Amino acid sequence: MAASEDELLLPRLPELFETSKKLLEDVEVATEPTGSRTIQDKVSKGLELLEKAAGMLSQLDLFSRNEDLEEIASTDLKYLMVPALQGALTMKQVNPSKRLDHLQRAREHFVHFLTQCHCYHVAEFQLPQTKTNSAENNTASSSMAYPNLVAMASQRQAKIERYKQKKEVEHRLSALKSAVESGQADDERVREYHLLHLRRWIAVSLEELESIDQEIKILKEKDSPREETACHSSLPEKPPMKPFILTRNKAQAKVFGTGYPSLATMTVSDWYEQHQKYGVLPDRGIAKPASADFQRAAQQQEDQEQKDEESEEKALHRMREWDDWKDTHPRGYGNRQNMG
């Protein structure tokens, strides 16, 4: 009875796979926006068919980790791509409120596909890190002061190699496609065709996982500023910092004072040259008598300073008198012309 049920399920599995694969190709080459109703209907239909196909594969138990790649039939190799197709269609879903869920679900599908291919040794590649390992690596990398330039260079080189391999695989696929789809290819060509498809999807899955991890990190950190603001607001306010005075400015204020009159009017060299010019410098402790020119210049300077002081006092006196007059005579005082 179980064998008859399997026979009824087997013919439907290729149909489900090919239909869902065709829907994914239509979505990828469509010119309409991804968020349009037509595209989203195709995405939902493809995911529904792939879910049924995955259930059938689980019931039929086509793949086992105890067997080698050579033990899998050539016609069954393509069903290893079911998780990769699920991940690709999940990435096409458009719903901003559920974007994080879609990314995590797509990541699970891609990791499942890569794990299967790694177990069967379909190609040489490094499995992506799990959530636990990635969390530990993020903690370790955050504690480092500088990024690991060697790791970044190796990642860049790995991307370049994957890109070259992907282009080579696509070129070989285009050469085998017509013969395989028309049924004219032998078993060896069919097997090579499906293996090339698997290797192409391995490269695509690795690229998608990198972009998924980056987008998940951005979405999770989007709400972190709010949490940090809440944490900062709960902390007690610190007292304001005391003003500080530079030692240099403090010492300079002691010498020159804080206002303009305290500043020096001439340097020591200027003073020395001025006194040397008029011959009033001391000679061996005995001061020379001041010359008539120097005495006359000194007297003129004193007279000028006295005149300046007197003029300043007069100007100040006039300003004070004017202020007193304005206090006792309000504006408009004495204007008797416009009285009613």
UniProtKB/Swiss-Prot annotation:
The keyword Iron-sulfur does not apply. Residues 223-242, 291-340 are annotated as: Disordered. The modification N6-acetyllysine is found at K242. The keyword Acetylation applies. GO terms for molecular function: enzyme binding; mitogen-activated protein kinase kinase binding; protein domain specific binding; protein phosphatase 2A binding; protein-containing complex binding. Its main location: cytoplasm. GO terms for biological process: B cell activation; negative regulation of apoptotic signaling pathway; positive regulation of dephosphorylation; positive regulation of transcription by RNA polymerase II. It is found in: Cytoplasm. Residues 47-61 form the UIM domain. Phosphorylated. Residues 292-301 have a biased composition (Low complexity). Keywords: Acetylation, B-cell activation, Chaperone, Cytoplasm, Phosphoprotein, Ubl conjugation. It holds the Pfam family TAP42. Residues 302-312 have a biased composition (Acidic residues). Residues 226-291 are annotated as: Interaction with MID1. It comes from the Eukaryota. Residues 313-330 have a biased composition (Basic and acidic residues). Expressed in spleen, thymus, liver and brain. Ubiquitously expressed in B lineage cell lines. Belongs to the IGBP1/TAP42 family. Interacts with PPP2CB, and with PP4 and PP6. Interacts with MID2. Interacts with ubiquitin. Interacts with partially folded PPP2CA, but not with the fully active protein. Interacts with MID1. This is Immunoglobulin-binding protein 1.
